[in-house]
Regions:
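Terminal low-complexity/charged segments
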Residues: 1-208, 283, 365, 369-371, ...
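Metal/cofactor-centered catalytic core regions of large enzymes
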Residues: 42, 135-146, 151-569
Length: 569
């Protein structure tokens, strides 16, 4: 690799702090470094890079590498954002017989969900992990069956259930464990992505919260590794999310392109960036409309959705469909932008800028909006730092993080970029970040269309080399989507790890809910802009009366809007 390798100073500091601990080091790209370290030093190394060198834990995953090196492997991917911007992945090999490695979570809380998932999917034991509950697997899943092991199962067959009961224990961190009685309630499996929230309350005040997701886990990673070719996974990644699918397919294709050293033409890169910003527009306007709805301002809700329709028209003009599916391929993009389409898109962007400004002025001058959002759902900057939050969540808590600026990808190195942050740490701050990002997206769309490079759209004729790996990433509306791909020797992926932005934000929701009222819960959850379709139920536990009640989500939503006739009474 002839280009200058970034991250040398971090590596030197690591060698000085931990002599002899780094067993191997390799660059996948000029700014992506993977180091293999001695397993017993894993927590100390990750903590050192995280807190002392300015890293953020972007994704954590396992890999069954017994066919390659005789061991399992666990990867901790850190985005280095203090000084030189680069990626450092800390890798450890886990003995295939012992199956244990030291947990990083006690030192770096951001590792908690990733380590729980590695335990679920591979049966690897993070020794010292504070929360050993299942994360992904259901209660009735067999104990010794681990889906992502290479020799474990056929993804098309689901094993027979081992129990009919729901055994998951919801935890009240700030109360007595005897209050944690889990009621058995209905889950409507016809819903796209049900979730169960449990609020521990004293009267109307939320003492703590816990929640369980993954009720409809799709098993995409196993599907990709066993049944799909490289470009077929591109279309699967498009469908990770109904709103930010193009961000996921961009992150996936970029991961393979980085692994193979494929240089995507500049025109294709710029088109990717333009479409990512169109996707950001309709996502942010949707969230702003929902914020109006949760505060009882339904005229604002309808007006934001009216303006959002313009962004959907942009997508249809540029891509042929209101959803930007099926455009990315490894090596470039499938469809060019026509001159007349770009002219029409510029006109729509100008109109949208005027419409959004009018709506924002109306929104921020509405008294009820200020009363319901200022000081509500606070996310302390230290909590956001400890858990490596992303997107408007972390930016609204004083951390100016944005992958488009920190690690410019596709065409963003050529676009005018401004990172927005707020200091309020509350719901209104998250709304303001999204509002400012809407204006920035419109500016980038205009600039990209005016300065679209010439040249081809695709690179073709390359050969996939087995067992190459690299990261790909994109700044989706909710934060960065991180993909890691390792090529296989059968024209399929050996391993694909897909981490959506909301996955990085869920663990801190309980901190945002604490100290607020039950009627604020839907608004606080909505300010996270969670990437799931519905919440079927919420259980409210009165820690003083030691009673629990299952509240349908529609009833909680009504209470959030009307703030009368409490469902708890």
């Amino acid at each position: 690799m002839s280009e200058e390798k970034l991250g040398q100073q971090y590596l030197a500091a690591l060698h000085q702090a931990f002599p002899g601990v780094v067993l191997d080091e390799a660059w996948q790209t000029k700014d992506q470094l993977t180091i293999t370290v001695k397993v017993n030093y894993l927590p100390e190394v990750v903590e050192f890079l995280y807190y002392q060198q300015g890293g953020w834990l972007s994704v954590l995953f396992g890999n069954d590498e017994r066919q390659l090196c005789g061991h399992y492997a666990v990867y901790y991917v850190l985005s280095m954002e203090q000084g030189t911007k680069c990626w450092i992945t800390v890798r450890v090999e886990v003995d295939a017989n012992k199956l244990e490695f030291p947990s990083v979570t006690p030192r770096v809380p951001a590792a908690v969900w990733g380590e729980r998932e590695v335990r679920d999917m591979y049966g690897l034991i993070p020794v010292g992990l504070p929360d050993e509950r299942r994360l992904v697997l259901p209660d009735d899943w067999p104990d010794e069956l681990y889906p992502l092991r290479k020799d474990s199962m056929d993804y098309r067959q689901r094993p027979a259930p081992t129990t009919d009961a729901e055994t998951y224990e919801f935890i009240n961190e700030l109360g007595d464990k005897k209050n944690n009685v889990v009621p058995i309630g209905p889950l409507h499996v016809t819903s796209d992505e049900p979730g169960h929230f449990r609020l521990f309350v004293d009267g109307e005040n939320i003492i703590d919260a816990d929640y369980r997701l993954f009720y409809v886990h799709r098993g995409m990673e196993k599907l990709a590794e066993t049944r799909m070719g490289y470009n077929e996974v591109t279309f699967l990644s498009d469908r990770v999310c109904g709103i930010c699918g193009f961000a996921h397919s961009t992150a996936y294709t970029t991961s393979v392109e980085n692994a193979m050293g494929i240089q995507v033409p500049e025109r294709a890169q710029m088109i990717r960036a333009i479409l990512l910003e169109v996707e950001r527009l309709h996502s942010h306007l949707l969230n702003l409309g929902l914020a109006c709805h949760f505060t009882g301002f339904d005229s604002g809700f309808m007006q934001f959705f009216r303006v959002r329709e313009t962004s959907m028209k942009m997508a249809e003009i540029l891509t042929g469909a209101r959803k930007t599916y099926g455009l990315n391929l490894i090596g470039g993009i499938r469809r060019d932008l026509l001159k007349e389409d770009m002219i029409q898109t510029r006109q729509l962007a100008q109109q949208m800028r005027r419409d959004v400004q009018e709506l924002v002025d109306m929104l921020l001058s509405t008294p009820n909006m200020e009363q319901r959002t200022v000081g509500i759902g606070r996310l302390d900057p230290e909590i956001a730092r400890d858990f490596s939050n992303v997107g408007p969540m972390v930016c609204a808590s004083g951390h100016a993080r944005d992958t488009r600026a920190d690690h410019p990808f596709v065409g963003y190195g050529l676009l005018p970029m401004e990172v927005h942050s707020e200091q309020g740490c509350d719901v209104i701050s998250r709304l303001k970040v999204r509002i400012n990002e809407v204006y920035t997206s419109l500016n980038m769309i205009d600039f990209g269309l005016d300065n679209l490079p010439g040249g081809p759209l695709m690179v073709e004729g390359f050969t996939y080399i087995p067992h190459r790996f690299a990261l790909g990433f994109a700044e989706a509306p909710r934060g960065d989507d991180i993909h890691w791909s390792m090529t296989g020797d059968n024209q399929k992926l050996y391993r694909w790890r897909c981490r959506a932005a909301t996955y990085a934000n869920w663990p801190t929701l309980r901190y945002m809910l604490r100290g607020n009222t039950v009627s604020d819960a839907p608004l606080i959850i909505g300010s996270l802009d969670p990437c799931y379709s519905c919440t079927d139920r919420m259980t409210v536990v009165d820690v003083r009366k030691k009673k629990s009640k299952v509240v349908p989500y529609k009833e909680l939503e009504r209470y959030s809007i009307e703030r009368k006739n409490s469902p708890l009474k």
